[in-house]
């Protein structure tokens, strides 16, 4: 098996029994199970959900996206070795820690394979729940140009790049394109304020206006749990994005849960603590890959300018990145995952074959 064979790049072609189209995201693909299979698994596996809950198989890939494009490497390498397993392992660890700290549940019911989650269907909140402890990235770029109000929050004068903020900030943005909301442009990833959410809470998917307080509490509490655990590993939790949704419990009550992934190198910035104390930034997240791309290509404006999207897509499609750059990303992801979980990240030689075997023999889901 070659290195390229060990990478799961295409994850939407598994022969999983489903009666609806596979939903393919940038990194994960979702297979909605039939009603019969959902009910059977809930009964035979003892999942703590109502028997009519729709279930899905969520399969992560090793693809890497940046600046809204998928990149690839030399030698037919269509992803980052170990990336998918690392992301899932980190999220699994944090979700377990959340439960131990009395926070909300997640959508995950079962983990058949390092690349696979069995999840319950949730009603998503249409908000990217972003939390920031340091001023860096897009916030710093805007601040350095004179902007002081972010998502309805006014920042003080005199802040410096990469410094710790006086308070933990919640700076939400829209999840997907939302139409008909006063003052909110119909564009993806638009910054919004708490006042925007309160005035239009149902349009953003909240069932009760009081749940806005709950989502902010779960966001801050989750951030603090991860931040403390990372600090014990001499890592700095800089900022992150969470997602939330509603599910119905066995008593028929609606409850807010964590969705997607949490505290990963894809959804967060994580800095090395020792380097930060020395005045340097050593990224243990995808931000390092973004910085590599900005330095690698002669015209970085293509990656930053949304008006040049066709050029950006061509750049990603037509340029194979150096193998060493791809392996550097692999080492970043597997390294931080092993720090967080305390265990080695499995790198199966043929992950697709392994997934099919498990889902056939242990779950009877392969056609």
From Swiss-Prot:
The organism's place on the tree of life at top rank: Bacteria
GO biological process: one example: 'de novo' IMP biosynthetic process
Chain segments annotated as transmembrane: none
GO molecular function terms attached to this record: ATP binding; phosphoribosylaminoimidazolesuccinocarboxamide synthase activity
Alphabetical UniProt keywords: ATP-binding, Ligase, Nucleotide-binding, Purine biosynthesis
Catalyzed reactions per annotation: 5-amino-1-(5-phospho-D-ribosyl)imidazole-4-carboxylate + L-aspartate + ATP = (2S)-2-[5-amino-1-(5-phospho-beta-D-ribosyl)imidazole-4-carboxamido]succinate + ADP + phosphate + 2 H(+)
GO cellular component: cytoplasm
Pathway entry: Purine metabolism; IMP biosynthesis via de novo pathway; 5-amino-1-(5-phospho-D-ribosyl)imidazole-4-carboxamide from 5-amino-1-(5-phospho-D-ribosyl)imidazole-4-carboxylate: step 1/2
InterPro entries for the chain: SAICAR_synt/ADE2_N (IPR028923), SAICAR_synthase_Vibrio-typ (IPR014106), SAICAR_synthetase_CS (IPR018236)
Pfam families according to UniProt: SAICAR_synt (PF01259)
EC number: 6.3.2.6
Protein family according to the UniProt entry: Belongs to the SAICAR synthetase family.
PANTHER family referenced in this protein's UniProt entry, alphabetically: PHOSPHORIBOSYLAMINOIMIDAZOLE-SUCCINOCARBOXAMIDE SYNTHASE
Protein name according to UniProt: Phosphoribosylaminoimidazole-succinocarboxamide synthase
